[in-house]
């Protein structure tokens, strides 16, 4: 779901990724015995913030790009990746209505807006609260992570209206998480409006998929420090 139905513009942007991604593929292809976590650590070492930004923009997934860009890499990154593997599996089991993808040293969790909000609204539905309650249980089990909440819309309406709506929705989710006991210091909010579609906006199905909220889950400084210490032992 994350890597199909891209717009023509996004396909053009992705051409610029080919040399970069080929380099990563060549590195990892020679390491067939690596685990998913170890491969994530290798990608983190090779990537860096610049590549993360390029990948995020070209794929229409800024959460994915930010995780790649913030990767620590090496042995420390592998330890963080192992912890993220466990958290991702727990989210998949606990929140079946969410799409969960493991990327390097982080996790992207995506909810369709129809699960969280009524059309053109920013107040959470009862179904939304039920799904977020499930996610909150897992987030509390892993307190040493930061959570960036990103709002996205389709292209219906004006850019300004959609930008404002995306921010309002992300803020609604953040406020609910904080109200339910997730530390506000872990939460940041971003709204992207219609600027980063992952799917075509020419169809009702594509527009529905573009109306989404994404969670970027990454290691905080405490987890990074502990992983670095463990890697040196």
Feature-to-residue mapping (PLM):
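Structured segments of extracytoplasmic/periplasmic soluble domains
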Residues: 57, 78, 82, 94-98, ...
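Short, low-complexity, glycine-enriched hydrophobic/amphipathic alpha-helices that associate
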Residues: 32-89
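C-terminal motif of bacterial Sec signal peptides marking the signal peptidase cleavage site
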Residues: 27-30
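Amphipathic, membrane-active segments
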Residues: 84-111
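Periplasmic peptidoglycan-binding/anchoring modules of Gram-negative envelope and division proteins
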Residues: 93-94, 117-151, 178, 208, ...
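Periplasmic OmpA-like peptidoglycan-binding domain that tethers envelope proteins to the cell wall
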Residues: 152-226
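Bacterial N-terminal signal peptides that target proteins for export
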Residues: 4-21
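Extracytoplasmic/secreted proteins, especially bacterial periplasmic and envelope-associated proteins
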Residues: 41-42, 46-53, 66, 86, ...
